[in-house]
Amino acid sequence: MELIEKHASFGGWQNVYRHYSQSLKCEMNVGVYLPPKAENEKLPVLYWLSGLTCNEQNFITKSGMQRYAAEHNIIVVAPDTSPRGSHVADADRYDLGQGAGFYLNATQAPWNEHYKMYDYIRNELPNLVMHHFPATARKSISGHSMGGLGALVLALRNPDEYVSVSAFSPIVSPSQVPWGQQAFAAYLGENKDAWLDYDPVSLISQGQRVAEIMVDQGLSDDFYAEQLRTPNLEKICQEMNIKTLIRYHEGYDHSYYFVSSFIGEHIAYHANKLNMR
């Protein structure tokens, strides 16, 4: 992994690395925050998945998470949201193609050559992190919007691999809303059964479980009713007896003003779980 940015932050280092991804067949950037204690001991890892139009920079520059990661001794890994490059398929829209990988494994041309974000996040990236950084095997996952969707899907499908999961403003029923329907049709084809593998509400209804789910949702979010539908997640978790900490916040929108307001509580939540033995 090639170090391309290095910034001192709260006694640790906010770095950005570049590497070639075997899963995605392209060069990828990834942000890694190493708290002060990482110089002397191995620490657990929180993976953060960003939303539509984002890259590895949004979370590391806008959330203020470094203060809390340093306090709680957690390495934070923030990858890009899709494969990148002139040779990678793209679309002339913000919600498909580069910047909109949806954390799935595409099966349809032309997307299936590079768009294997599920494999990248689940397998390739953690292996790289374990090899290159002072990381323990204990990891949690979180994300925002499309990334909240990705975090929920990865945790629900691999409950033994992630200690805890949380999300900000996640797309909880992608097979039922325009963002998900358009992306899934392109990436996965018209067989809607394939879509359900990447739909948190559907996965829970099929019996997939995690110990607990934490979600924060702003009530002044322009996408709340049409695209996100947090109450669908709350309802299915109640029906399936999955413990939740779902909080609705008056006045907060879909932006990083919202994420930065509550990211400290999310990191504390994950730290509590990660440090339990």
From Swiss-Prot:
GO biological process, one term: formaldehyde catabolic process
Record-stated family: Belongs to the esterase D family.
Keyword Hydrolase tagged: yes
Annotated EC: 3.1.2.12
One GO MF term attached to the UniProt entry: carboxylic ester hydrolase activity
Record Pfam families: Esterase
Domain of life: Bacteria
Organism: Escherichia coli O1:K1 / APEC
Entry keywords, A to Z: Hydrolase, Serine esterase
Active site: S145 (charge relay system), D221 (charge relay system), H254 (charge relay system)
EC main group: hydrolase
Described purpose of this protein according to its UniProt entry: Serine hydrolase involved in the detoxification of formaldehyde. Hydrolyzes S-formylglutathione to glutathione and formate.
Reactions it catalyzes: S-formylglutathione + H2O = formate + glutathione + H(+)
Matching InterPro entries: AB_hydrolase_fold (IPR029058), Esterase-like (IPR000801), S-formylglutathione_hydrol (IPR014186)
Protein name: S-formylglutathione hydrolase FrmB
GO cellular component: cytosol
